[in-house]
Amino acid sequence: MFMNRLFGKPKQETSTLQTLDKLNETLEMLEKKENVLLKKATGEVEKAKEFSRAKNKRAAIQCLKRKRLYEQQVEQLGNFQLRIHDQMIMLEGAKATTETVDALRTGASAMKAMQKATNIDDVDKTMDEINEQTENMKQIQEALSAPFGANDFDEDELEAELDELEGAELEEQLLQPVPIHVPQGNKPARAPAQKQPTAEEDELAALQAEMAL
């Protein structure tokens, strides 16, 4: 019943947070009361010691009775705190569960919306369009890369013209005069070039002429 009340309400998250805050405030209040009672119990023990030293047994026993009452209240407050802790843990767990379910529900709704916006037929159609555009682009690129005016010439005519050029070149080579070969031994011998005397040779000749005198 508690989980059913927790789900499906628009302001449930705010209410849960407020409840947790209230429980936390109550827990702090109980802890403060527990500390006060513990101090009172400790004070009764000190009083009992003083009365015991004063040989006032009856007063000392009364102090111990009050100490027992304070301890019972402390134990009761401890049980209250334990229950509040349990309740807070349950609420926090329920809050986490609610947030998880809401997140899953939101994700499922988003997935459902995307599936409605995109189905298998749309995917197939899109892929066909992409393939068609790709093929068209290939044809355009092939047309642009072909040599300009390449289909305007006849291959047979070009080959005939090439044969004609080769025949004319061969005929021109046949009509060129044959060079006359002169034997090496029949060539007229050249007179050896007269060597010009150097400056040292001139000085040597002049010295020899002086010595002859």
From Swiss-Prot:
This is Vacuolar protein sorting-associated protein 32 homolog 1. Residues 180-213 are annotated as: Disordered. It is found in: Endosome. Component of the endosomal sorting required for transport complex III (ESCRT-III), composed at least of VPS2, VPS20, VPS24 and VPS32. Interacts with SKD1. Interacts with BRO1/ALIX. It holds the Pfam family Snf7. Component of the ESCRT-III complex, which is required for multivesicular bodies (MVBs) formation and sorting of endosomal cargo proteins into MVBs. The ESCRT-III complex is probably involved in the concentration of MVB cargo. Residues 11-42, 118-176 form a coiled coil. PANTHER family: CHARGED MULTIVESICULAR BODY PROTEIN (PTHR22761), GH13992P (PTHR22761:SF10). Keywords: Coiled coil, Endosome, Protein transport, Transport. It comes from the Eukaryota. Belongs to the SNF7 family. Signal peptide: none annotated. Its main location: other. GO terms for cellular component: ESCRT III complex. GO terms for biological process: protein transport; vacuolar transport; vesicle-mediated transport.
